[in-house]
A protein has these predicted regions:
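Conserved active-site segment immediately N-terminal to the catalytic lysine
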Residues: 184-195, 205
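Active-site C-terminal subdomain of aminotransferase-like
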Residues: 25, 197-255
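Active-site phosphate-binding strand-loop segment of PLP-dependent enzymes
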Residues: 124-178
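Structural motif
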Residues: 95, 140-145, 170, 191, ...
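Conserved PLP-anchoring active-site segment centered on the Schiff-base-forming lysine
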Residues: 89-104
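Conserved N-terminal alpha-helix of the aminotransferase class I/II PLP-enzyme fold
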Residues: 34-84, 101, 105-109
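N-terminal "arm"/small-domain region of PLP-dependent enzymes with the aminotransferase-like
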Residues: 1-43
Length: 255
């Protein structure tokens, strides 16, 4: 049986072709706010550090961060974060919900790491969402997307095994953060790039991290595991606490 071709009528098409699961259109007010006094400035200078500090403070307020949680940021977007988490957040074994292109990518990163055990994967067809409760109780990291960018399918954010205090809940919120309700206390790492709901540009990752996640990062960093400097989460934490990034950030994205 042949598949019929679907065609949307012109009045239903978005006025701007950038509408979709890609980056959001940036508001004119934000484009006008690009400050020549900040653009092209060293990220070690007060002007940029103050900007980073204001972003961290604003996100802390937006998400009503519980005591001990911190906003951490670095360069490279959520794609870089998957590799950074593979190096510096997963201790031995992770479990993943995969239900689209983006939730699958973190699982692939973990599967390719020879220093980790093979990840447990709970898969569901694109457009549907697997059950968070099916994630392994033995995994030291459980991971999924709050909103699967490629399909729009939304998963709940909750701790699947709350009695396991060694299990970190790591949620990709790139196309959900700022637009979907969340209790950050139900996560240990709620990470995202800002080019969706925040209508910024790409190039950075930001994350709300729990004390347990911060402790895990510090412990793995102190071990004998090799971690590239660019992907070192402890480096990101240390710099964020100084309102900096390890290397030059996309300043326009922060603005």
């Amino acid at each position: 049986m042949s598949t019929p071709e679907l065609s949307l009528p012109a009045h239903l098409l978005p006025a701007d072709g950038r509408f979709g699961c890609g980056p959001s259109k940036i508001r004119p007010d934000q484009l006008a706010a690009i400050d020549p006094e900040v653009m092209g400035t060293s990220h070690r200078k007060p002007a940029v550090k103050n900007l980073v500090g204001s972003v961290r403070e604003g996100l802390s307020t937006l998400f009503s961060l519980p005591e001990g949680y911190e906003i951490v940021l670095s360069v490279g977007g959520a794609t870089a974060f998957w590799d950074a988490a593979t190096f510096g957040l997963i201790e031995r074994h992770s479990a993943h919900l995969t239900f689209g292109e983006f939730s699958t990518k973190f699982a692939k990163s973990a599967a390719g790491a020879p220093w980790l055990d093979a990840p447990s994967i709970v898969e569901a067809p694109a457009g549907t969402v697997p059950d968070v409760g099916d994630l392994s109780a033995e995994a030291d990291v459980v991971a999924w997307a709050h909103n699967e960018t490629s399909t729009g399918a939304m998963a709940e954010v909750t701790r699947p095994h709350p009695r396991n205090d060694q299990q970190l809940v790591v949620v990709d919120a790139t196309s959900g953060a700022g637009g979907l309700p969340v209790n950050i206390a139900d996560t240990d790492v709620y990470y995202f790039s800002p080019q969706k709901c925040f209508a910024s540009d790409g190039g950075l990752w930001l994350a709300a991290m729990s004390p347990a996640a911060l402790e895990r990062i510090e412990r793995i960093n102190a071990s004998e595991r090799y971690i590239p400097n660019f992907l070192n989460l402890q480096t990101a934490v240390d710099n964020s606490r100084k309102n900096q990034t390890y290397n030059t950030p996309a300043i326009a994205t922060l603005l």
